[in-house]
């Protein structure tokens, strides 16, 4: 179907986000919407930033994109670390560019904080490597309980939320740099500009079965071979990429002879289901998301109808 600019009569074009758990069909719905209402797609899956991580992230091939431009795919090498702040800048640039051509930007993905960074009012405090090194040294010479007491005096909210040393140091770094609690920089549920979020959810048991089939399909499509090739390019050194679902598990098969591909696949299924539950918790906590059943045969039409009432 040919894309028609502003086909739902909203002017200027609004930002649309298709959100939800992995495996719910977000990519297919975003393609249908882009074709029907006139849009281009912006990736909001942090693991699809990585070049070469294709099968295990369910990244659409060029043919599967059906001629619709996709932004912010393949932006990082596997050893690079993803940055929410950098993504915010890139996503907002892409949004502005798409809207300037009379089309709707359609963000699609399940990386909740990245989506919030693109859509909502969210500040990122600066960093000071020298200050961070000093704080890390102080922590090494002290103990975490004393550091927690120190943070509690200036930011009790963050102290209660933070469970690891890295974020504890970061919270104190931000306070010393800005004089503001780290918790004051947390995202507010306030859109930067008019936005409509469509969430996909539905039968949990059905989703679990779908995720299992998806992992087995990825293995059959060559996920183990993809991981082996990326290992030669330094996948194990990538702090973010090496933790991706499927990639973490199949990397183990290369270093642990007793850890089989079959076990890696089963562990990937378990980890993917756990991740999906966390995504559902994240997105259902946002009252602005308008939900649809991912299994509905009328999904594109229902989504378009919702948008027409915006």
Curated annotation (Swiss-Prot):
Swiss-Prot/TrEMBL cofactor(s): Mg(2+)
Enzyme Commission code(s) on record: 2.5.1.75
Task: List ligand-binding residues for ATP.
Answer: 20-27
Recorded hits in InterPro entries, A to Z, give: Dimethylallyltransferase, IPT, P-loop_NTPase
Coiled-coil residues are none
Is ATP-binding a UniProt keyword of this protein? yes
Its recorded name reads tRNA dimethylallyltransferase
What's the source species for this entry?
Renibacterium salmoninarum (strain ATCC 33209 / DSM 20767 / JCM 11484 / NBRC 15589 / NCIMB 2235)
């Amino acid at each position: 179907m040919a894309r028609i600019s502003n086909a739902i009569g909203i002017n200027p074009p609004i930002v649309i986000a298709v959100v939800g758990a992995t495996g719910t069909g977000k990519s297919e719905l975003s393609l249908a919407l882009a074709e029907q209402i006139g849009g281009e797609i912006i990736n909001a899956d942090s693991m699809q930033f990585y070049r070469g991580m294709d099968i295990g992230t369910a990244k659409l091939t060029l043919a599967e994109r059906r001629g619709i431009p996709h932004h912010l795919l393949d932006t990082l090498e596997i050893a690079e670390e993803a940055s929410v702040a950098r993504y915010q800048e890139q996503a907002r640039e892409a949004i502005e560019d798409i809207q300037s051509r009379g089309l709707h930007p359609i963000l699609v993905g399940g990386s909740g904080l990245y989506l919030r960074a693109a859509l909502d009012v969210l500040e990122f405090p600066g960093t000071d490597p020298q200050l961070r090194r000093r704080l890390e040294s102080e922590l090494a010479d002290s103990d975490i309980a004393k550091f927690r007491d120190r943070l509690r005096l200036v930011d009790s909210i963050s102290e209660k939320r933070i469970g690891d040393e890295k974020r504890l140091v970061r919270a104190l770094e931000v306070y010393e740099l800005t004089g503001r609690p780290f918790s004051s920089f947390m995202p507010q549920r306030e859109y930067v500009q008019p936005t409509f979020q469509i969430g996909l959810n539905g039968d949990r048991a059905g989703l679990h079965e779908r995720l299992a089939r998806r992992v087995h399909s990825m293995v059959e499509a060559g996920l183990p071979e993809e991981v082996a090739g990326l290992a030669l390019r330094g996948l194990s050194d990538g702090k973010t990429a090496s933790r991706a679902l499927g990639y973490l598990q199949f990397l183990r098969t290369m270093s642990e002879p007793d850890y089989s591909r079959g076990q890696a696949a089963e562990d990937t299924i378990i980890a993917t289901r756990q991740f999906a539950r966390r995504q559902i918790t994240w997105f259902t906590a946002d009252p602005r998301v308008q939900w649809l059943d991912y299994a509905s045969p009328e999904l594109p039409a229902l989504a378009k109808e919702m948008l027409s009432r915006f």
